[in-house]
């Protein structure tokens, strides 16, 4: 199982692959779409079970092909969707000015924030997949990021990928 951040540091996509299946969390942009397609090919993903489009006000359509799509823009404000896919359980919460996605893989949880997400209580996860969006709604222990962002403490080494082993081990790159 692999989780990779790809594309632009301003709008990184998340590609989750397990064997030949994948889930993609997409934030838009042609260059990011191309990076996603390259990463899917690199990881040998033949089936994209889900593309979750995290944009609440997209300027262009998401053209990534998938068995299912979950566009945040089509969700009512303050609603959630939960989908079980081969690589992960995907939970998307749409707020007024953004969305939060929590991925559950085995006993590990990962969060992605797009836009501004305000919650009464923070969501607690092991890993935050970072973007320019300040993750005030998320309490996390570890970070995956393409680069350091203004809201971050000065982190010296950042990994953009994580490989999860079947029996609990992991490796960041």
Which residues make up each language-model segment?
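Non-globular, low-confidence helical/coil segments that flank catalytic cores
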Residues: 1-173
